[in-house]
């Protein structure tokens, strides 16, 4: 459950290490984002040699949340951290590697490139 001012780890090698959610996309009054949702975020911590610099406003897809997600079969899944992958305007990831597990809901949201790069899909 991600909302404005929530800080997320970045799960790719784009150069950013931590981002802060500015806005949840998908409606003017939408407050929370879950796995598979797109957010607008500001880069708070970044590597100096990375593609994405500190202070840049980016779009990102939430791939892991600490708040549990209920699946269709009734099972619950949750992760140890809140994490996102930075994407471009064509919904393709900027980085070439994804770190850590990615939720299956990312596949249902249509981000197949992220799922194929992920080492593990839960």
Swiss-Prot record:
PROSITE patterns in UniProt: RIBOSOMAL_L14 (PS00049)
Key words, A-Z: Ribonucleoprotein, Ribosomal protein, RNA-binding, rRNA-binding
MF terms in GO: large ribosomal subunit rRNA binding; structural constituent of ribosome
InterPro entries: Ribosomal_uL14, Ribosomal_uL14_bac-type, Ribosomal_uL14_CS, Ribosomal_uL14_sf
Transmembrane residue ranges: none
GO biological process: translation
Annotated GO CC locations: cytosolic large ribosomal subunit
Subunit description: Part of the 50S ribosomal subunit. Forms a cluster with proteins L3 and L19. In the 70S ribosome, L14 and L19 interact and together make contacts with the 16S rRNA in bridges B5 and B8.
Similarity comment: family membership: Belongs to the universal ribosomal protein uL14 family.
HAMAP family the UniProt entry points to: Ribosomal_uL14 (MF_01367)
Function summary: Binds to 23S rRNA. Forms part of two intersubunit bridges in the 70S ribosome.
NCBIfam families xrefs: rplN_bact
Protein's name in the database: Large ribosomal subunit protein uL14
Organism field: Sulfurovum sp. (strain NBC37-1)
